[in-house]
Amino acid sequence: MKTIRIIGAGLSGCEAAYYLLKKGYFVELYEIKTIKKNPIQHYDYFCELAYSDSFRSTDLNTSVGTLKKELELLDSLIIKAARYASINQNNELVVNRIEFSKYITNYLKTFNNLKIIEQEYLNIDLNIPTIIAIGPISTPNFLTNLKKLINKENLKLFDTVEPTILKQSINMDICYSLDNNLNYLYCDLNKEQFEKFYNALISAKTFNSPLKNEIELLEKNNYFSIESLAKNKQEFINHFKPINNNAYITITLKKDSVINNLYTIVNFQTNLMWNEQLKVFSLIPGLENLKIMKYGVMHKNNYINTKKLLNLGVQLKTNKNIFFAGQIIGVDGYVESVCSGLISAINLDRYLNNKKMIIPNKNSTIGSLYNYLLKTDSNFSPMRINWALVDMIGGFELSDNSKKIYSKRAIKLIKQYLKKINT
């Protein structure tokens, strides 16, 4: 029986373990939390949900609803557990955190081919097939060893994400480019517009992190949010110098390096609550009807330069026995982490059986996420699923009808992928 190691019993690690246990591998699952918890851990069960109890929408018209459906078709343990521990009947999958974690822990322990090793994993053995599925707050000792494996410049320790908005929601009669260079768009604010925007920004509510002193930690490492910058009004004004003489300040939008339909609001990394981001940033002229596809976040995180380090099978290019899963590859969100664990496990199994490693078609939600991660540049920030990542059908739009088309197409493609991996 072939031995596989999985480092981390979080969402991605447990999803990967479940798939490989079913395949008959002997799985060594390393998890240190029972002997040494990090600041956001409280229980000994696997898959502890620290930041939220929600797996977001179940509506198939949403990208994340479709992503969950794709995972169900692929027999996801985590989604099965979330359904079991669900505490509401609405279009949102909210779970009882304890029951959710208990279900996964107890289910995995029924496998005789699972060995749970409750200790810190320090030395990465390159001779043993391994999935590295560490979470956002990993032990310093393990990170030191990881840096030796991938070089420290390829590992980022903080997440400072600017909001990403849909191009079609930008009013091009107000926002403008210079010399027809659509890589950058500009939004001018006069003094009255600035004052209204500024007052809304400084009074907006921020996210309360479960990690104590997280903002202080970020600022200590020179990562400052837009709301923190706004504490000094004049410094804030100087930060957004006007391009036109008639403007008081100018805010810049930058086109995404992979998806032409997405723009980020430059230097707007933020810790504002999501509903507050929509309310405040829609006060920027030209963004009155903005659709935010990825909200800004700032938190402690560990993620690697996926495009540079990993191949199509999320396998380390420099050592074929090492695979990665979870937030460390640059996915953002519970459901996204689950799918990364499953894809890593599928491809590790295929690699060990001398089969071609494959990911789903780029117009499935799973495939679209991987297509983005494996193409984006080294300056990317973690991505969560959204419909802008799939190919357009007759011009990109977000009507209910188009979402339905995208969802049906994605589910059909995952069914085709399921047939491929089972042959």
From Swiss-Prot:
SUPFAM superfamilies: FAD/NAD(P)-binding domain
GO cellular-component term (any): cytosol
Cofactor requirement: FAD
GO terms for MF: flavin adenine dinucleotide binding; tRNA (uracil(54)-C5)-methyltransferase activity, 5,10-methylenetetrahydrofolate-dependent
Keyword tags: Cytoplasm, FAD, Flavoprotein, Methyltransferase, NAD, NADP, Transferase, tRNA processing
Protein residues bound to FAD: 8-13
Subcellular location(s) per record: Cytoplasm
Alphabetical list of InterPro entries matching this protein: FAD/NAD-bd_sf (IPR036188), MnmG-rel (IPR002218), MnmG_N (IPR040131), TrmFO (IPR004417)
GO biological process, alphabetically ordered: tRNA methylation; tRNA wobble uridine modification
E.C. numbers: 2.1.1.74
Signal peptide: none
Domain of life: Bacteria
Enzyme class: transferase
NCBIfam families: PRK05335.1 (NF003739)
Similarity annotation: Belongs to the MnmG family. TrmFO subfamily.
Role of this protein: Catalyzes the folate-dependent formation of 5-methyl-uridine at position 54 (M-5-U54) in all tRNAs.
Name under which the protein is recorded: Methylenetetrahydrofolate--tRNA-(uracil-5-)-methyltransferase TrmFO 2
Organism: Mycoplasma capricolum subsp. capricolum (strain California kid / ATCC 27343 / NCTC 10154)
